[in-house]
Amino acid sequence: MGKKLMRIGISLPGELLDKFDKTLMKRGYSSRSEGIRDAIRTYNQHYEWMKQIRGSRSATISIVYDCSKKGVTSTLAEIQHEYVDMISSSVHFHMEEDLCFEVIILRGEGEQIVDLAQRILSIKGVKHLRLTTVPEEKNE
């Protein structure tokens, strides 16, 4: 990757930008641009990590989403039903009036777990997703 810096423009909700700026100040970043570069590097590293998840795994997928967004709840349920053979359990609770937190506990092949997580993350209204996996240990 070259050293040339590219100028880009992005649109963000004001509340998200304010929170980002406060985080940058607390962490001592010299500029918003450096914070965005760091966030993109972290995002890319996470994507690379997800590509390496292979083999039999136990996992949790933690999701925060806006349940007032049209279709988010039904789409989430439809996707989960496609992976019903992998999902052991899920827990759902309301954080606020329009904000829900859900944890899905599952077991399956790493590639399928990642596929499920990526499909959920692509739903409009999903604000946060965290995937945690543990390789299955074989008893010998």
UniProtKB/Swiss-Prot annotation:
Q: Which Gene3D superfamilies match?
A: ACT-like. Chain A, domain 2, Met repressor-like
Q: Which GO terms describe its biological process?
A: response to nickel cation
Read off the InterPro entries from this record.
Acetolactate_synth/TF_NikR_C, ACT-like_dom_sf, Arc_rbn_hlx_hlx, CopG, CopG/NikR_regulator, Ni_resp_reg_NikR, Ribbon_hlx_hlx, TF_NikR_Ni-bd_C
* Single GO term (MF): DNA binding
Q: Which residues bind Ni(2+)?
A: 81, 92, 94, 100
Which keywords belong to this entry?
Answer: DNA-binding, Metal-binding, Nickel, Transcription, Transcription regulation
UniProt cross-references to CDD domains, sorted A to Z? RHH_NikR_HicB-like
Q: How is the cofactor bound?
A: Binds 1 nickel ion per subunit.
Q: Respond yes or no to whether keyword Metal-binding is given for this record.
A: yes
Its needed co-factors are: Ni(2+)
Q: What does the function comment of this entry state?
A: Transcriptional regulator.
- Assigned protein family: Belongs to the transcriptional regulatory CopG/NikR family.
What protein name applies here? Putative nickel-responsive regulator 3
Q: What is the lineage of its organism?
A: Archaea, Methanobacteriati, Methanobacteriota, Stenosarchaea group, Methanomicrobia
